[in-house]
Amino acid sequence: MSDNRALRRAHVLANHILQSNPPSSNPSLSRELCLQYSPPELNESYGFDVKEMRKLLDGHNVVDRDWIYGLMMQSNLFNRKERGGKIFVSPDYNQTMEQQREITMKRIWYLLENGVFKGWLTETGPEAELRKLALLEVCGIYDHSVSIKVGVHFFLWGNAVKFFGTKRHHEKWLKNTEDYVVKGCFAMTELGHGSNVRGIETVTTYDPKTEEFVINTPCESAQKYWIGGAANHATHTIVFSQLHINGTNQGVHAFIAQIRDQDGSICPNIRIADCGHKIGLNGVDNGRIWFDNLRIPRENLLNAVADVSSDGKYVSSIKDPDQRFGAFMAPLTSGRVTIASSAIYSAKVGLSIAIRYSLSRRAFSVTANGPEVLLLDYPSHQRRLLPLLAKTYAMSFAANELKMIYVKRTPETNKAIHVVSSGFKAVLTWHNMHTLQECREAVGGQGVKTENLVGQLKGEFDVQTTFEGDNNVLMQQVSKALFAEYVSCKKRNKPFKGLGLEHMNSPRPVLPTQLTSSTLRCSQFQTNVFCLRERDLLEQFTSEVAQLQGRGESREFSFLLSHQLAEDLGKAFTEKAILQTILDAEAKLPTGSVKDVLGLVRSMYALISLEEDPSLLRYGYLSQDNVGDVRREVSKLCGELRPHALALVTSFGIPDSFLSPIAFNWVEANAWSSV
């Protein structure tokens, strides 16, 4: 190196070392050259009344929802923090598992002290149930761990006591459960059995000498597993067990067992272990339970369906074991109802964040020296998010309808509720997971950051696809129910009534070969194609099962061999039911901007559902040209929904504090001053 070059290098290094001002303070660098955050509200107008749309979407108890939002925002228990000039409340997912569990319980105590759970088990009627569902949904928007822990206590333990039990159980347990004097959990799932509840291996016998039941875990696969609340906090559990009376297995029954005393010590003849760290929901203390000759009073059998007398005689008004098991399972529908609705609120959080971010974040320019383009002005970005937004809208109406038929249920509607809740739970939770993944990718690297929520929510909600029924199993249950209804009506030569199959009493709809834009957006065309798909798949499914049975296969094995048709049919039934709920909501609206926008949303839901379903081509409902027409119309609808994007997510009614920093001033939230 020459002397001159060495001197120059030394001079540069000296300037670096001695420089006292950061580069940004250099007056020659204009601040205007830096990116500035511009709130979407400055450039995006609302083309309809967002408050009216919110009332439609939430469906019920808007005032109660806003009340509990306020309760959470005013307490430091909910991890208030300032980012980018705004206050946010969201869990600290960086805490240890033990810390997350304890703060979750403290948050529940806070909600209890402020009257949130008043009447949840002791008040009856549709209004009381809808209020409870609304408050639980807001808990889930804040933190899925809070809603799951509350849900296990009230909807699983509490509802089991309420619906499986009788007056003696109600008087002893319901008020104490509502006040958290008793903390309940629900021991159904075992290491070896989940969806197949009838196969569980826990065994209960009766001792007439002491008038006690004796519960045992006979093998390791019979240990109760994933029992929310069992690892730390629960004092009591509902035990699902095979009931053996005088050497005869009477099937699965439910019992109340104490597992901890009021000091938190584990009771004798009980062993409990922790399930450990999970991919999400670490605020819920999932545990494993073994029973070693645990004795409980005879009165602890939940006896609404069956009972055992003091001298050991088994008594039930329902003689058929299958019907008796069905009666036990019917009250558990509430779990699928709450899961379906909470999945949609999770999707709303993800879309609110991703769409708001895409309305302020820019990337690349399309003209030389031109301004960078907003992410949501790229057709590809619209294609990623706006169809999911439309689906979320349609599924909001579906979830509301499911809640309404659930709270107004009668013995005559139990079958329909089981079928609809199974389909909705599967399709809505799958939709949520797909939506969160797309939102995570749509916000780029910011989606990996925990405080921005969209990435974290994937782990928090992933479990929904398998608990309260594996989604694929639920789809097959839907198809089996439709099969049974179809065969029954044909055998009796009766018209179809119930399960939404009434359209099959009319002639088969004929679809036009040429699909124009107006045809594709016509509600009658959309209804026809959804009905045709369901009708044809049901006929194909029953025909295939019948052919297999004709070759000597059992009905159950025939169902297994026809699984592809069964899953296609389950999806077709559910998507048609969802379409009907948004059509019903739209029909009730007066002419105006809300109705117009909802019409666009409905068409987007219908057409994107058709575009994404390979069965339309597989079974020949649409030609390749038709599929191209649908695809082009979806792209047109993306452009028409784009101006409404901000208003559509604002209509979700989720307070800013429950979203994340990248939904707002992401520049200020990441500034050096915030470090």
Swiss-Prot record:
pH dependence: Optimum pH is 8.5-9.0.
Function: Catalyzes the desaturation of medium-chain acyl-CoAs to 2-trans-enoyl-CoAs. Active on C8:0- to C14:0-CoA with a maximal activity on C12:0-CoA.
Induction: Not induced by dehydration or abscisic acid (ABA).
A Gene Ontology term for the protein's cellular component: peroxisome
Gene3D superfamilies assigned to the protein according to its UniProt record, in alphabetical order: Butyryl-CoA Dehydrogenase, subunit A, domain 2 (2.40.110.10), Butyryl-CoA Dehydrogenase, subunit A, domain 3 (1.20.140.10)
Lineage of origin: Eukaryota, Viridiplantae, Streptophyta, Embryophyta, Tracheophyta
Name assigned to this protein: Acyl-coenzyme A oxidase 3, peroxisomal
Keywords: FAD, Fatty acid metabolism, Flavoprotein, Lipid metabolism, Oxidoreductase, Peroxisome, Transit peptide
